[in-house]
Amino acid sequence: MGCAESKDGEGEAQNNRPKYRSCTDTCWLAIYIIFWLFLIVIAIFSFVYGNPLRIINGYDSFGNTCGVKYNEKFQGFPLSGMNTLDKPELFYFDVKELKKSLKICVKSCPAKTMTKGSELLEYYSQTGTQLCKYDYNMQQLTTAGNDAKTFNFLGPCPSFPVHESSPVLHRCVPKGTGEKVQNYYDMLNNWDVAQQFVGDIYSTWHIIAMVCGLALLISIALVTMMHWLSRIVSWIICVLVIVASVALTVALWYAYYNIRNKSGVNTQYSMLEEFVRNQQAVLTLAVLATITMIILIVVIYFLKNKLAGLSALFEEAGQCMMNLPGLLIAPLLAFLVLIAFLSFWVAVIICLATASSPGQSPIAPFDNSKAHQQPLPANALFVSNSTDVNDLRPNARVEYADAGVLRSMFWIYVVGLIWTVEFIFACQQFALAAAVAFWYFQKPTSTPTFYAIGKLVKYHLGTVAKGSFVITIFKIPRLILTYLYAKLKKGEDKGSECAACCLKCCICGFWLLEKFIRFLNHNAYTVVAIESINFCPAAGIAWNAMATNVLQVATINSVGDFILFLGKVVVAALSGLIGIVLLKDKPGLNFYMAPVIIIIIFSFFIAHIILSLFEMVVDTLFLCVCEDKTLNGRSGRWAQSNLAKLVGEEPLQPGEEPPIEVVQMMPINKQPFSITRLPQSDPEVAPMSAD
């Protein structure tokens, strides 16, 4: 059938087009909604039982978190529920009995060593820092002398001597290097590493958010550069990635040099294991950055001759973006949704890591088994027969027991992270693919971006939920195998070389499958947008189109996608460099590389969302060109532009073959991916119908 407009040709095309658009993969949308309802239930419990400030600031023996205005009131503990906003530091009554000692929140740590009650009173008068129990009348110290009933590890005042201290992680740690001080650091080092990790993220969330915002600006700048400098953008990105990788590598080695050789290291922090962990982490990252930098430089050197061929590809994609300025809306919306989700996810993970329920503990040595801890009764924690609060000598204190079942929900949220991030990416890819396909096969004056987003929300959320779940299925086993391989190589028992080789092969196989499925999804979304069919049939149609042009597909995806990957590396490297500069000297962090790693990962996600705009435009245009060439031959729209180079042919010269009446940016006469379907219940006409 020819391409000229005729009633017969138009009628045949209309008969081949799907007349009705209906919802696709609705079952998968229901599954995704149920999964998210489960995540919300977990989040509610984590917000109720989790409190990161309990780990960061510490809490006293009465259940009050230091440095907090509102604390929960426990019946039977008159000193609970206090406003400790002006008391950010945690003070132990006896450093020799840390596990038994009463602990309170104070305004500041003792600035001098004290050995008498009168010195405590004088220090209170000068600084306003009360080192005795909250309800103790400090004026009684004038007559208390050095009575052991007053000054002991149970209070109401601390045992002597009260050592000069400095705050370390909001805990008053005596100055010096003696055995007592070492015991204090042993207690700090016994904290859960995961709790320290999330505590550092919580403390630096504003810096993480700021650097992620900068990553967004850098990504937008790269997209703008691709639009206006399409002919040389490949070279610019290669130069930028070399500069950024070299700068990040130098910064990491410089940070490692400072940690290892810096004179006058603060001995208060050098006794913490986190100091060593930072040094090891920086060294590891520096080595990895060096290896990555060398690999990137070598690969860029060998691909330099193929970069020139990408100019036509990026130029045509830039032309598409000029005609469709609304394409930038989809990545920006995806960015906002991703930031909102990641913020929610981090908040829930922090609360899950610190989730605990209040319990009462006797004044007796306790250990990590928590066998002595009892959950707090619903109506009362401790009931005293004493009518005088000042005479209250507690035989129990508030301790928070880990909520083990709730913490185990962490792994559900790991799956939720992968699936939801992939779902956000898939929604963006679908909107972009649909908009570009509508632009290619319809009039150039239309701006179909909002139209494509509307169709996605109204009809095709189930399809993107299914597509993102398929990727999740292959990604999770790969991550598990990668973790097992790392543990195997790190452990003393390295295992057999055969087992290690099998793990490597499995990891590589899952990685290849994931990449293949991701690429197939890109093209399947284009077919779904046009044909309004389910995911699996659409993937089959897209695969057939790609299989007939396998050489061109390999070239575009090997070189073009590598350049876009380099753009993402530029954003992640620059963001990591900024994060190191801002965080390396920030006090109070257990493990400052933790937020730096989070910054790099989040920045790469952000760059992936923004820069995948070009990737989707290129892949969609190529799929449209393949189908246009198959159906219309040299009379199709593809032959009139640089798109012809994508399939190994030269574009038609002016006057070489006069185009027919509606060739330029008008609907082609044959329906791409045409599938005859019966009318559905929804009478809305599919987007490919003629105007």
UniProtKB/Swiss-Prot annotation:
InterPro entries: Choline_transptr-like. Glycans are attached at residues 261, 385. One of its GO terms (cellular component) is membrane. Keywords: Glycoprotein, Membrane, Transmembrane, Transmembrane helix. Residues 1-10 have a biased composition (Basic and acidic residues). It comes from the Eukaryota. The keyword NAD does not apply. It is a multi-pass membrane protein. The chain crosses the membrane at residues 28-48, 205-225, 232-252, 282-302, 332-352, 408-428, 527-547, 562-582, 591-611. Its main location: membrane. Belongs to the CTL (choline transporter-like) family. This is Choline transporter-like 1. The gene is Ctl1.
